[in-house]
């Protein structure tokens, strides 16, 4: 039923909104997150709908922004509010709400009461031209909770919606608290079939309800307390508590002629779509002042807006309270402007902020953002994007691997699927697709390829004269094994599943729980079946784990006994760690050393100080095209030698196919020291486009104050690894030498020459590099 049954008196309520320019809002000196670098990924959801993740490094930290754009001119697309399919007013996760209702994407929508399993959206809801619900309590004295509307002609607009509804007979008029909204029933509420067909659900939630059944402007039935009644198809029900009936509505009887008078700022009967939100964000392209309900500071945020021409809808979620800093009201306004919004409003934010989409690549409804509470909050409703076009013929094919990095002898399964003109995904059986691997040898079995040689390879898929390809890499060797738990404690009869991770020579991780060979040192204590250990008797032993020559041990203790001693496993040497001797072979050679100067408070004998520094200088300046001093250096190099010394500020050098950037992290990270370095080093590296990248810093990323910033650096560097570049991060810090390889990036720490007490550090180590034709080797040289 489209219209609310009863008489409607219309009146427009216009809310005043203060529009702000940057200067009038903040004044001079007020900062917002300035972007230094950004990484974007874009996916297609369906024709006319795109999803983009924009991960930005700002001077305030990482800011992850999720945006969906919808072309409202696409005739097969719809935007509409959705609620629980299970029970009216039941809170569900955004993913479930959208999936159950058949949407392809969407976000959380309106504000609601957090307590309990049931609630009601604050704002008005119109779906497919049907008035679903509306509240009477919002925006009475000021515009606080905005709502979006699209009329039957497709015209979008925003309004601080207000409504009042009165129900009465000739004796008394009652003010209604809501229409199909039942967060509480202190005051009477209107109910029709757009919410439910009978009152059984309400009777379970609220005790002793009394219902007036109304048809043709007449009360046809008044229920007993708690009695379930049927909602008439062409009428409505007024629901109230027994106390309210007794104290304020006792003058109503069966047969009374009644009237329903409704006044609202927008005629809902003329609307095709409506859903509620928070304060307005943009009006006429300008950012508004934040009203009293908009949370202050940087928070997780959800926003919705439309472009000036009304052709594009913009959904946005900004992650917060985790690795991402969130956004202020002002920053959210700037972001919505950047993505093309002219009119916009807040939707519910904080723990509710959720974006879900089924992209062509994902193939299933997936939460795209990082929800701030670690798991999805149950909310009252969501705004869904719907594709109404039926599945058509395949227009293109795509290919996806189960892993971007493969190992020799281990299968990689590819998925080949088709897309129609609306990007509906169509699965294709393997026997209809021709698969081929170029660059490495191996064996195909359906969609699974098991490589037998290493290297870069291309997989092509051909179906009905359409093709797709994937470029990947096969690692040649297992470098090390790492069990999730290197010790296990059990009782007799208990079992333990062993989770095993394999790292290849470039530090890429592969799961190897079931493909690793396990052998128990003392089989009397326990046995292995695949990757499951079963404890047989009390005692302690070691499980030997073997894969492709790599070995690890897990200590198992059964009962209250002393743990067995674990065998020592030799460290695996990096394949690029080789002897480097300068020759006239066309290669480029450079040396890197850590901090030489002493900056402590102890007194050092002048001769000892000079001799130690001179010895280091003789090593670093010799047999190289360039000498790099990654820590404070208080002695000059020979003028004829190309060199770069640490100054505590950003520096960059491009030589011999190598990009070398010095980035200061003195204060616990790049951002805390000088955030502009992000823009500088990424721009310089991309402009130089060298195949070898060396980042020198004065504090190892794992020790930065912000783990989010360290993770962002790794993501940036991994992007260069994916381009086939060799990447090194050399920290000049503390008193020990160490190296590790992770996801293709080599992390090396060079210790300081001097201990804090003024003695020479015997662990002092420098690096010698050789670079030629994209091939890199390095040697760690201890200088004693």
Give the label of every model feature segment:
Residues 6-11, 29-570:
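Gly/Ser/Thr/Pro-rich low-complexity, intrinsically disordered segments
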Residues 62-63, 72-76, 306-313, 578-591, ...:
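Beta-strand-turn-beta hairpins that frame and shape the catalytic cleft
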Residues 363, 709-778:
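Conserved beta-sheet core of the metallophosphoesterase superfamily
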Residues 559-649, 710-719, 723-725:
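Divalent metal-dependent phosphoesterase catalytic cores across multiple superfamilies
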Residues 656-693, 703-715:
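Binuclear metal-dependent hydrolase catalytic cores centered on His/Asp/Glu-rich metal-binding motifs
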């Amino acid at each position: 039923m489209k219209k609310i049954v009863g008489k409607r008196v219309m009146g427009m309520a216009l809310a005043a909104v203060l529009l702000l320019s940057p200067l009038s809002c903040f004044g001079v000196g007020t900062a917002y997150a300035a972007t230094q670098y950004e990484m974007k990924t874009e996916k297609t959801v369906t024709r006319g709908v795109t999803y983009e993740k924009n991960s930005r490094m700002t001077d305030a930290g990482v800011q992850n922004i999720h945006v969906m754009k919808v072309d409202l001119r696409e005739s097969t697309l719809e935007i509409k509010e959705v609620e629980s399919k299970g029970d009216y007013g039941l809170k569900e996760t955004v993913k479930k709400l959208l999936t159950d209702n058949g949407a392809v994407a969407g976000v959380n929508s309106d504000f609601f009461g957090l307590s309990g399993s049931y609630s009601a959206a604050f704002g008005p809801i119109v779906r497919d031209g049907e008035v679903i619900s509306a509240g009477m309590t919002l925006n009475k004295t000021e515009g606080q909770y905005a709502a979006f509307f699209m009329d039957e002609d497709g015209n979008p607009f925003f309004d601080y919606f207000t409504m009042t509804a009165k129900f009465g007979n000739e004796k008394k008029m009652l003010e209604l608290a809501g229409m199909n909204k039942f967060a509480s029933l202190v005051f009477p509420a209107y109910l029709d079939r757009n919410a439910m067909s009978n009152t059984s659900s309400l009777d379970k939630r609220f005790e002793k309800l009394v219902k007036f059944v109304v048809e043709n402007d007449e009360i046809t039935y008044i229920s007993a307390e708690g009695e379930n009644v049927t909602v008439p198809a062409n009428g409505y029900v007024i629901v109230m508590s027994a106390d309210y009936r007794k104290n304020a509505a006792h003058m109503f009887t069966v047969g009374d002629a009644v009237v329903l008078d409704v006044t609202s700022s927008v005629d809902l009967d003329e609307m095709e779509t409506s859903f509620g939100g928070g304060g307005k964000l943009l009006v006429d392209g300008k950012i508004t002042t934040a009203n009293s309900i908009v949370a202050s500071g940087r928070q997780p945020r959800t926003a919705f807006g439309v472009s000036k021409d009304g052709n594009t809808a913009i959904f946005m979620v900004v992650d917060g309270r985790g690795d991402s800093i969130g956004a202020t009201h002002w920053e959210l306004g700037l972001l919505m402007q950047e993505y093309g919004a002219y009119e916009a409003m807040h939707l519910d934010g904080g723990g509710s902020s959720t974006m879900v989409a089924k992209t062509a690549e994902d193939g299933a409804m997936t939460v795209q953002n990082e929800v701030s509470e670690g798991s999805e909050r149950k909310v009252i409703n969501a705004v869904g994007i719907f594709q109404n076009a039926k599945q058509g013929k395949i227009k293109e094919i795509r290919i996806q691997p189960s892993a971007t990095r493969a190992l020799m002898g281990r299968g990689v399964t590819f998925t080949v699927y088709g897309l129609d003109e609306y990007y509906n995904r169509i699965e294709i059986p393997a026997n209809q697709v021709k698969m081929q691997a170029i660059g490495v040898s191996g064996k195909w079995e359906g969609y699974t390829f098991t490589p037998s040689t290493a290297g870069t390879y291309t997989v092509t898929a051909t179906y009905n004269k359409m093709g797709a390809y994937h470029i990947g890499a096969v690692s040649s060797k297992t470098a090390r094994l790492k069990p999730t738990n290197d010790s296990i404690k059990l009782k007799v009869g208990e079992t333990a599943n062993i989770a095993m991770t394999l790292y290849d020579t470039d530090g890429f991780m592969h799961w190897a729980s079931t493909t690793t060979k396990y052998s128990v040192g003392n089989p009397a204590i326990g046995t292995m079946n695949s990757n499951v250990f079963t404890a047989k008797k009390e005692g302690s032993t070691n499980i030997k784990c073997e894969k492709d020559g790599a070995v690890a041990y897990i200590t198992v203790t059964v009962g209250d006994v002393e743990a067995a001693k674990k065998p020592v496993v030799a460290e695996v040497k990096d394949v690029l760690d080789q002897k480097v001797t300068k020759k006239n072979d066309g290669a480029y050679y450079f040396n890197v050393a850590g901090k030489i100067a002493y900056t402590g408070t102890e007194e050092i004998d002048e001769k000892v100080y000079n001799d130690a520094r001179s010895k280091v200088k003789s090593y670093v300046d010799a047999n190289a095209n360039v000498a790099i001093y990654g820590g404070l250096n208080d002695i000059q190099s020979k003028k004829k030698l190309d060199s770069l010394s640490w100054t505590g500020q950003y520096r960059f050098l491009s030589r011999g196919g190598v990009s070398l950037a010095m980035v200061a992290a003195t204060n616990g990270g790049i951002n805390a020291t000088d955030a502009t370095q992000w823009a500088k080093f990424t721009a310089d590296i991309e402009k130089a486009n060298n195949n070898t990248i060396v980042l020198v810093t004065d504090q190892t990323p794992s020790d930065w104050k912000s783990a989010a910033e360290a993770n962002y650096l790794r993501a940036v560097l991994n992007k260069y690894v994916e381009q086939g570049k060799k990447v090194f991060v050399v920290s000049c810090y503390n008193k020990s030498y160490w190296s590790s390889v992770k996801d293709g990036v080599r992390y090396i720490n060079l210790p300081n020459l001097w201990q804090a007490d003024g003695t020479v550090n015997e662990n002092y180590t420098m690096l010698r590099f050789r670079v030629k034709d994209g091939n890199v080797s390095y040697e760690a040289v201890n200088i004693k």
